[in-house]
A protein has these predicted regions:
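Terminal presequence/propeptide segments associated with secretion/organelle targeting
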Residues: 2-5, 10, 17-707
């Protein structure tokens, strides 16, 4: 089942009702007293309002980076640190064969050289409040579709109201605790964001897929951008050459002091999605369907992309971002399933549900908001398994995979604004913008053929549209022959072709394929939606039952891409029966670089090998160890979306940027195991060292003024 349709929930405590200290993704405006007191006990040294509320609160320096990552403002002139992989798509879009910033890196020596990225934005959270009573009054007795429409309407109303005070603000209404709570969050978005600095990809993505989700790591996963603002108001503005660097309300102080084992560490960012209240039945479906399908289909997609990317530099640039994104979640799903099995997560969760059932029985709970029917929930998941499988294969195989099929979807769904006279529908037409520089025809054809063939081999016959009969009867089940014919006869990829609402368009074989696939999806969802709604109602009750059973404990909501704080400590963990070190050094990076002749993921430019071997680390070396420390571990609770999250010490100073989790914790989206789960961060001193010694970015270092 899609993450977006399931579970805005809370904590999963397996085998115990007690919450571990170093667990949780906490909203800041209503941070429980017990959590703040525990933070202080572990080494946090600032007043509570320095987290949220004061003008110079730490949270005011943290940003949502373009809707998929996190970041932090580090200077009075709007300079932003985030991960290299967060800036990856922007860097890739700015790169050309002649100016390959992805391969060679980039440093703007002046404001004038900073490169605008048209697709980036950053958001600052200005305020958050609980509006649950208001929402519950509006949605009482409504179904899921009606509730969604009401929430959208309320969001628009609140945004319209706030814009009468400040037109640069907007409000988002989000469900928390699986729909048991609703918060309204006020944001301010800045659209003019420019690339300032990036290391070469060989360093920003050092280790590649070989090291992804692994420890130890030596990746310099950072990139630097700047926010620009209206010169008169210091507020958001569309890109203009007249815009000036933004003067932020607050920025994070950058520390050169580093960290020691068991030091306090805190992340603040925008974690995307967790499902820690998910029932054992939901975890089983996640393992057997969503994750398994994702791995199986992406095995094929990744192999096809790599084949063409290895042949041609232009194709590499076209598909590199797609490849990296796809590979990341492919490996995540593999690791998550292994973790689910290795710790017996489904069994543990079933035992915990039995505990909840005993509590409900002993207390004779009659509240319909709490009295979950676990047998009904189990049956609902069984009944939803087939449509869930079809939906998973459909999404992985067809949505945003092939340029031709995606264009067919866009026309079929009316996603492209018609051109021509508004008073004469027969003269109106749809025309695609020329994006031929973004994709490779041969790759697209092979991908379409492979996805259609794989879909047919794994989905029941009842869910295969008519096109599969055509491929069988007219093309002898030869998917290559079919796609050769399809691409030769469809106008979907013909530059500047105009699609009118007429027989020619309806008879286009590409359009016909798109219509059949969309109709299939609608057919699947017609029967599936009612199951999803029923599942969500029972999961919602399960969440509330846990909260009420553990009334004496604070609970955090599942991640939903709103700002969250997580705290913990610096430290390693047991790997294969041995204690891992909690940081890596330049020496370990050099050793891996030496393997670059045989392993592409460890191959770097010679200057990088020279820099790290020279050991001219100066003020960036750790004062205790004397080493250049590169990456480090904490037990902060993070997930996707936390990439780029600032990592603060107990004094609220920036010591690193979170960029990954470890292999042994890949089930953390549904279960946080404090013994295994680790946040991997890039040491801010390694970031500054590369800016200094490789980039010679003196003006930026003066602006940041690390202490």
């Amino acid at each position: 089942m899609k993450k977006s349709t399931l579970l805005i929930a809370g904590l999963l405590a397996l085998g115990s009702t007690s919450m571990h200290a170093d667990e949780g993704m906490w909203t800041l405006y209503n941070l429980p007293d017990a959590v703040y007191e525990q933070m202080v006990a572990e080494g946090f040294q600032l007043p509570r309002n320095m987290l949220y509320g004061a003008p110079n609160a730490i949270s005011n320096s943290v940003i949502n980076f373009s809707g998929f990552c996190s970041g932090v403002v580090v200077s009075p002139n709007g300079l932003v640190f985030t991960n290299h992989h967060c800036g990856f798509s922007a860097i890739n879009a700015l790169s050309t064969v002649e100016h390959d910033y992805m391969k060679d890196g980039f440093y703007a020596k002046s404001y004038a050289e900073e490169l605008p990225s048209k697709d980036l934005f950053v958001s600052f959270m200005k305020k958050q409040e609980d509006i649950t009573p208001r929402v519950n009054k509006l949605i009482a007795g409504k179904n899921a579709e009606q509730t969604e429409a009401i929430i959208d309407s309320l969001t628009n109303h609140l945004t319209d109201s706030i814009k009468t005070i400040d037109k640069t603000l907007h409000i988002s209404v989000d469900a928390f605790y699986e729909g048991n709570k609703y918060y309204a969050t006020t944001y301010q978005d800045f659209q003019d964001v420019r690339l300032v600095f990036t290391v070469p990809k060989s360093m920003g993505k050092f280790g590649g897929e070989t090291d992804n989700w692994m420890w130890p790591r030596q990746t310099s996963d950072f990139s630097v951008f700047r926010i620009y603002a209206d010169p008169k108001t210091n507020g958001p503005a569309a890109y203009s050459k007249d815009n000036v660097p933004y003067k932020p309300e607050n920025w994070a102080p950058v520390s050169l002091e580093g960290y020691k084992d068991k030091d306090f560490a805190m992340t603040i960012g925008y974690p995307g999605s967790t499902n820690r209240y998910l029932s054992s039945f939901g975890i089983q479906q996640r393992r057997d369907i969503e994750n398994t399908v994702q791995v199986q289909v992406r095995d094929i997609k990744l192999a096809i992309m790599k084949k063409y990317m290895d042949k041609n530099e232009k194709t590499r640039l076209q598909y590199e971002n797609k490849y990296v994104t796809s590979a990341n979640y492919w490996k995540n799903s593999i690791g998550m399933n292994k973790c689910i099995d290795s710790i017996g997560l489904i069994r543990q969760k079933a035992e915990y549900e039995a505990k909840i059932q005993r509590w409900l029985d002993e207390k004779a709970v009659k509240d319909p908001a709490v009295n979950v029917d676990l047998k009904k929930l189990s049956n609902l998941y069984k009944e939803s398994a087939e449509p869930a499988l079809v939906q998973a294969y459909w999404n992985e195989s067809f949505w945003k995979v092939s340029e031709l099929i995606q264009r067919a979807f866009d026309i079929t769904r009316g996603a492209i604004e018609p051109q021509g006279p508004k008073d004469d529908e027969s003269a109106q037409y749809v025309q695609f913008k020329d994006n031929s520089s973004d994709w490779n025809l041969a790759l697209d054809k092979e991908m379409t053929a492979a996805m259609l063939k794989n879909y047919a081999e794994h989905v029941p016959a009842a869910y295969r549209p008519e096109v599969f009969n055509v491929i069988k009867t007219k093309f002898g089940n030869n998917y290559k022959k079919y796609t050769d014919w399809l691409y030769a006869n469809s106008k979907l990829l013909v530059k500047d072709h105009k699609f009118y609402n007429d027989e020619n368009t309806l008879n286009d074989p590409g359009i016909q394929l798109g219509v059949e696939l969309v109709m299939l999806y609608q057919q699947v969802m017609t029967n599936y939606v009612s199951k999803i709604e029923a599942i969500e109602q029972e999961e919602k009750k399960l969440c509330e039952a846990k909260v009420q059973m553990e009334m004496d404990m604070p609970h955090y909501s599942d991640a939903n891409f709103t700002m969250r704080m997580s705290y913990g400590q610096v430290g390693g963990y047991m790997i294969g029966g041995f204690d891992s070190n909690y940081y890596t050094t330049a020496e370990s990076l050099v050793e891996k670089m030496k393997l670059g002749k045989k392993l592409e993921d460890y191959k770097v430019e010679p200057i990088m090998m020279d820099l790290m071997s020279a050991k001219d680390f100066g003020r960036y070396a750790d004062k205790t160890t004397g080493k250049m420390q590169l990456c480090f571990l904490t037990n902060n609770d993070i997930t996707g979306g936390n990439s780029g999250s600032p990592m603060f010490d107990g004094k609220g100073r920036l010591i690193g940027l979170a960029f990954d989790g470890n292999w042994d914790s890949l089930s953390s989206d549904i279960n946080f195991d404090r013994k295994l789960a680790r946040c991997i961060g890039v040491d801010i001193r390694f970031v500054l060292y590369l800016m200094d010694k490789w980039g010679h970015a003196d003006r930026l270092l003066k602006e940041i003024n690390p202490q």
